[in-house]
């Protein structure tokens, strides 16, 4: 009787353990800023006072002078006159000590200081696509990567996730055939926003 009870208890524990370690191949239903902060901390550790995403970066100051063509075509303060700008070039991920030789996306953010205390901000990546069609897919990919780092998932789990969420695979596929630029200033940056003109 004792052997049977122990055997049933052991099977129950194994069944519970397998269920607890099962990795979802579906993107989460929602993604909040706090979700990303948490997963970046899990993946890269605690770095007080440092941004959680694109943690390693360098800033620069400059000025933006719109072309005569832009001034003639667009009726917007951004193209009306010269403006001081602040730029930040960065490495993707949450590690402030990231290896700049890594084949990873780089970012560029630009803040335009316009008249009347107005600002305009744009951002770009060195990849023509993002790691997911929406925040949920990207968050799911980061969570799979963390589970793999913890030994709770495998490369097969990531492959299944990417098959279920093919948009999350495209950036990694693109990076495999494109080496990073030697310098931030010699890279091509792709806008992460779409602008329509009339």
What is the meaning of each model-derived region?
Residues 1-20:
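Gram-negative bacterial Sec-dependent N-terminal signal peptides
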Residues 21-198:
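Active-site-adjacent core segments of small-molecule enzymes
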């Amino acid at each position: 009787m004792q052997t049977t009870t122990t055997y049933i208890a052991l099977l129950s524990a194994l069944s519970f353990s397998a269920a607890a370690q099962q990795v979802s191949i579906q993107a989460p239903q929602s993604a909040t800023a706090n979700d990303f902060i948490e997963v970046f901390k899990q993946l890269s550790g605690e770095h007080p006072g440092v941004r959680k995403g694109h943690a390693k970066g360098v800033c620069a100051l400059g000025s933006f002078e719109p072309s005569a063509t832009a001034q003639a075509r667009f009726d917007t303060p951004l193209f009306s006159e010269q403006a001081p700008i602040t730029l930040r070039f960065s490495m993707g991920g949450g590690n402030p000590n990231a290896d700049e030789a890594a084949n990873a996306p780089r970012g560029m953010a630009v803040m335009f200081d316009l008249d009347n205390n107005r600002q305009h901000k744009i951002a770009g990546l060195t990849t023509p696509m993002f790691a997911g069609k929406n925040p949920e897919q990207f968050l799911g990919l980061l969570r799979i990567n963390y589970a793999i780092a913890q030994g709770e998932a495998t490369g097969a789990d990531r492959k299944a996730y990417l098959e279920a969420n093919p948009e999350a695979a495209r950036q990694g596929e693109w990076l495999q055939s494109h080496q990073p630029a030697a310098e931030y200033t010699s890279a091509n940056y792709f806008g992460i926003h779409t602008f329509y003109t009339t």
